[in-house]
Amino acid sequence: MGGPYIGIVADDLTGSGDTAVQFVRAGWATQLSVGGAEQALADPAVRQAEVLAVTTHSRPLAAADAAAVVRGEVERLRAAGVQRLYKKVDSTLRGAFKAEIDAARLAWGEDAIAVVCPAFPVTGRTVRQGVLYVGDRPVTETSAATDPVTPVTESHIPTLLGCAQLAAQAGETPAELARRIAAAAPVVVVDALDDADVQRLARAIGVLGQRAVPVGSGGLAAPLARVWAGGQAAGPVLVVVTSQHSAARQQAAALQQAGARTWAPTLAQLADDRNWAAWTAEVEAAEHGMPAVDALMLLAPEGRLAGLDADSVARRLGELAARLVLAHGAAGVVATGGDGASAVLAALQASGIALVDEVTGGVPLGTLTGGQAAGLPVVTKAGGFGEQDVLIRAAQAIRERRFTK
């Protein structure tokens, strides 16, 4: 690697840690430095990291001093080739809040947009009409107001920053939110009342690309780490469903309804070599010219046909899946049904799976070892396991995690 892709600049060590760990959970190789970027980047081990979190220790500093420190750190990270910046701030607005945000934005680039949302709903921090709440109270009515070093005197973040504020809008897409943010630049506070709002904002930041400087706590960092990981994924997640279990069929239907492009051969096509060759040629030719999708599904038909057993169905679909992966690329593979999972691995000549996590109980996530697609993310699932949305979640787990091959 040539150096970190993502830089995190935090005003204290604990905040740096609780933000950096969100990137670890999303699969990024992450290094936390107790000091600044210059010292960290001199370490060969740090140069191998994908995410570097640096600590400015600037929370108790005067505004001008804090701004100077932050500006220097961002400039050094930028010079080192960092492509994405996350400015970690205190979730109760302590410190030289405005000075550090302005310094980070200006150092990042002329067209940079600071997107500010310190919400962390799981810890009770939310932003409503621009006001930061801790539980049901504005932050100035909490102990943060009497902090002995950096007391908080303003709950309304747009007043504190002198900037625009955007309320959440029901049904708004991330792209629509991104357009509103861009129109309100260069500094924008965005409301977030719950995790869904924070996740939508993270996706909007992904749409904005490199010019966005997200400003927040661990609450925004968690979904953003997944969004940025998804930006590294190439191709669709290929889902292979061979199980006849009713749960698997319902899960496949849910995935198709969510937008997965689906190829489903008939029993007659699977049973006859000539029919099968013609159908697979049609699929492979069509996939060359079709628009990109997040998920592509190969779905075995329901029912039985004399002379056609489950192993043959699994083998044919597994071999087709392997050809699609090798010809077109894929972000990963999800296989439901033990025979189907075995067939996919056999067709790719994989020797095993290096496990890294699980999508949900009994649904492991890993990467293939050996064979023609070593390092390819893979989820395997028994046909009867999981809730109705488990295939959707499995595809998301692959797309929203960083895998280092």
UniProtKB/Swiss-Prot annotation:
SUPFAM superfamilies, per database record = YgbK-like (SSF142764)
One Pfam family linked to the record: SBD_N
**What are the binding positions for substrate in this chain?**
12, 59, 88-91
Give any GO molecular function from the UniProt entry: ATP binding
Q: Where are the transmembrane segments?
A: none
> What's its EC?
2.7.1.219
UniProt keyword terms in alphabetical order = ATP-binding, Carbohydrate metabolism, Kinase, Nucleotide-binding, Transferase
Which residues does the record give as ATP binding sites? 243, 337-340, 383
| Swiss-Prot/TrEMBL catalytic activity | D-threonate + ATP = 4-O-phospho-D-threonate + ADP + H(+)
Q: Which family does it belong to?
A: Belongs to the four-carbon acid sugar kinase family.
Q: What does this protein do?
A: Catalyzes the ATP-dependent phosphorylation of D-threonate to D-threonate 4-phosphate. Can also phosphorylate 4-hydroxy-L-threonine, with lower efficiency.
The protein's name is D-threonate kinase
Write down the species. Bordetella bronchiseptica (strain ATCC BAA-588 / NCTC 13252 / RB50) (Alcaligenes bronchisepticus)
The organism that produces this protein has a lineage beginning with:
Bacteria, Pseudomonadati, Pseudomonadota, Betaproteobacteria, Burkholderiales
